[in-house]
Every structure is written in structure tokens, then in C-alpha cells.
């Protein structure tokens, strides 16, 4: 594995990421959520993509793609491992969203190219990174109150907002993916909350990918 070449690709791709608002439709009609996991000891990459109506946040479509994993897990290069399955799930959708929430980092990455940025750039769709753990940068400690907020900074640059979406839960790291500003990324995530730690798009993507009870109940009620 030529990590020097992959690192150079990341730096080059990151230079093309658009960090300002360029939504084709604002407000969007459809928002997608995307989540990636692995099966069979990492040999299979599984990507779930869901479509929700906005502003009702009603689930209208979901797809799950499973493909052979083409790259081992290497910290800092996860997007190269996850992107092929995300693309496969994206191509399965019967209609394309105006905005995509990706479970993972956007520009809040050492080389400013997390999976949300990588995917958004490659398919040219506005994306937001919604990550559960910090990958780089520093932030001031948050209060325990829901709604507590702090910028994630690295080398004098704001990479994300660190936001405690729910009491007694760890904060989310909300970043520009592509074609969405960091402030708008936070605003869109806040508009898509329904009382859980995660916004509805990535909450549903996680539920579909992992066949969690919410998704099992949903499918049981479908005609």
C-alpha cells in the first residue's frame, strides 16, 4: 500500500472541496443519510443510504450495498476504504437527494479529507460530516448541558462544531463535507433532530445498516 501516494491524493482532492454553501435546492426536498460498516471480519464493506423528505423527515427509501473490501483499515485513510460501497449504495437510489449527511468526518481530518468530503467531492453533492469521535484538532471542554457548543480548531482554522446534542451523551463533531459551510452544517443537523443523539438522516442510516429495532419495526409496518 503506497501511503505516500494516497496522502498526496488526499491533499490534492482536499484543495477542491468547496467550504461554502452551494446547495442546488435550499431548502432541500430530500436529505440522505449514509453509514458504512463491515461484515465477515472486515472482508465485506456494507453501506446504507436512506432518503428522508424534508422538512417532515419521513423515511421514503433505503438501500444497502455490500461489496468486497478493497483496502485494509489504515487510520487517516478510511475514506478510500469506505467510498466504493457508498458509491454503490448511491447508485442504487431511485432519486438523488439535495443534501447528504455522512456518518464520519468531513474536513475535520488531518489532511482535510474525511469520508464526507471525499464522497461529496466525487459525486458532486452537498455533504455534511457527522462524526462521533474527534480525529484531529482541539476544543474547549463543553458543559454537560444539551446544546453546549464549541469550535473544533486546528492550526488556527475552524474545522467543525463540537455540539452536545443530548444530555448525558458525548458530543457530535459536525463539519463541512462539500458545498456546505461549517455554520450551515450545524444548522442543518439541528433542523434534523428528533430528540436522539444523532440527526434523523444518520440515525436512520445506522438503523438500516445494523437492522436496529427502529428499522425492524418500520419494515414490519410496511404493506
Curated annotation (Swiss-Prot):
It holds the Pfam family Endonuclease_5. The keyword Protein biosynthesis does not apply. Mg(2+) binds at residues 35, 103. The record marks 73 as: Interaction with target DNA. One of its GO terms (biological process) is DNA repair. The keyword Cytoplasm applies. Its cofactor is Mg(2+). One of its GO terms (molecular function) is single-stranded RNA binding. It catalyses: Endonucleolytic cleavage at apurinic or apyrimidinic sites to products with a 5'-phosphate. HAMAP family: Endonuclease_5 (MF_00801). Belongs to the endonuclease V family. DNA repair enzyme involved in the repair of deaminated bases. Selectively cleaves double-stranded DNA at the second phosphodiester bond 3' to a deoxyinosine leaving behind the intact lesion on the nicked DNA. This is Endonuclease V. It comes from Escherichia coli O139:H28 (strain E24377A / ETEC). The gene is nfi.
Amino acid at each position: 500500500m503506497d501511503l505516500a501516494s494516497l496522502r498526496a491524493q488526499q491533499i490534492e482532492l482536499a484543495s477542491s472541496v468547496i467550504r461554502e454553501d452551494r446547495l442546488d435546492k435550499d431548502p432541500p426536498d430530500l436529505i440522505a443519510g449514509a453509514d458504512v460498516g463491515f461484515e465477515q471480519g472486515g472482508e465485506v464493506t456494507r453501506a446504507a443510504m436512506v432518503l428522508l423528505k424534508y422538512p417532515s423527515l419521513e423515511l421514503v427509501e433505503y438501500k444497502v450495498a455490500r461489496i468486497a473490501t478493497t483496502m485494509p483499515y489504515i487510520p487517516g485513510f478510511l475514506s478510500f476504504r469506505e467510498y466504493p460501497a457508498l458509491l454503490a449504495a448511491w447508485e442504487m437510489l431511485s432519486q438523488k437527494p439535495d443534501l447528504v449527511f455522512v456518518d464520519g468526518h468531513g474536513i475535520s481530518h488531518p489532511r482535510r479529507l474525511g469520508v464526507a468530503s471525499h464522497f461529496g467531492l466525487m459525486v458532486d453533492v452537498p455533504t455534511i460530516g457527522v462524526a462521533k469521535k474527534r480525529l484531529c484538532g482541539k476544543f474547549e471542554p463543553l458543559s454537560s448541558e444539551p446544546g453546549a457548543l464549541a469550535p473544533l480548531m486546528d492550526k488556527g482554522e475552524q474545522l467543525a462544531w463540537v455540539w452536545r446534542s443530548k444530555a448525558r451523551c458525548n458530543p457530535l463533531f459536525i463539519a463541512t463535507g462539500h458545498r456546505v459551510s461549517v455554520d450551515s452544517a450545524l444548522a442543518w443537523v439541528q433542523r434534523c433532530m428528533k430528540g436522539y443523539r444523532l440527526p434523523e438522516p444518520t440515525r436512520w442510516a445506522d438503523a438500516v445498516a445494523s437492522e436496529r429495532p427502529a428499522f425492524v419495526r418500520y419494515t414490519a409496518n410496511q404493506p
